[in-house]
Amino acid sequence: HQWITEGARYEKHWAFTAPSKSAPPKGSLWGRNPIDLFIEARLLAEGLKPQQRATTVKRLRRVSMDLSGLPPNIKELDSFLDDSSPNVYERFVDRLLASPRYGERMATWWLDSARYGDSHGYDNDLENAQWPWRNWVLEAFNSNMPYDRFTMEQLAGDLLPNARHDQILATGFNRNHRIQTEGGAIDEEW
């Protein structure tokens, strides 16, 4: 730290700087919300133009793939195209968000990051009975559980006052790793 005591200048790390809200750029050719205005301004500054608006079927396919991992079926497409009400798109998205497929799709990212697997993933590769925790994650996404609660219950759900069974189950996250049983199993770990 000698360089500091000798008067060296340094900037505070960006992570310790409070974010400030920027006013959206003025004027718009196509933007419908503040994020669009920022994107439009940057595109114009770079001499670029946005892609043309996607067709209705492409938009439905994109949002369906994003939220459920599956394309819309023919019945869903026909129902959408036959509906002329002004909020048909919003209702389509709401149905996707209310579907169990939404939780499955969103949970995939978390399960992959947490290295979930149905086996121990080691040389003997035995079954790993972590599916109750996997199902808890799916339900957490489908019930729109707040992120702070989602992480707290996985890290320390068993330590919460009057912990419910599902909160204890959430701590399966802490056992979600490779396991080998060469030296036998320790009962307290299970």
Task: Pin down the residues of each PLM region.
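Short, structured secondary-structure elements
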Residues: Q2-W190
